[in-house]
Each structure stands twice: as structure tokens, then as C-alpha cells.
Curated annotation (Swiss-Prot):
Keyword line: Ribonucleoprotein, Ribosomal protein
Originating species: Azoarcus sp. (strain BH72)
This protein's name: Large ribosomal subunit protein bL33
Family named by the database record: Belongs to the bacterial ribosomal protein bL33 family.
InterPro entries assigned: Ribosomal_bL33 (IPR001705), Ribosomal_bL33_CS (IPR018264), Ribosomal_bL33_sf (IPR038584), Ribosomal_zn-bd (IPR011332)
GO cellular component, one term: cytosolic large ribosomal subunit
A Gene Ontology biological process term: translation
GO molecular function per UniProt: structural constituent of ribosome
HAMAP family, per the entry: Ribosomal_bL33 (MF_00294)
One Pfam entry name: Ribosomal_L33
Gene: rpmG
Amino acid sequence: MAKGIREKIKLESTAGTGHFYTTSKNKRTTPEKLEFNKYDPVARKHVPYKEVKLK
């Protein structure tokens, strides 16, 4: 069976709350690091989330 090219990543809050989302991305089409504005329930507002390696 072929191994998928999608890699699991962690989107971590830049607010310093420790909250994170997990998702996957295609490494071939998007080799750069992702950054999204998402809701942080700890900070109770939308903050930038940056991609970090999932351990």
C-alpha cells in the first residue's frame, strides 16, 4: 500500500495560551509554513496560529 503524502501538523496559538489545533497538509503543494487566524477559547478571541511540527 502506498504511503500518503499528507503530513499531520499542529497549529499552535501565538497568544501563549498553549491551545492548538491539529490538521494535515500536502507537503508537495504547500511546502511553506501555514498561518491562520483562528479562535482561541482560552484567550476568548481570534489570534494567529502558526504551524509547528507534530511530535
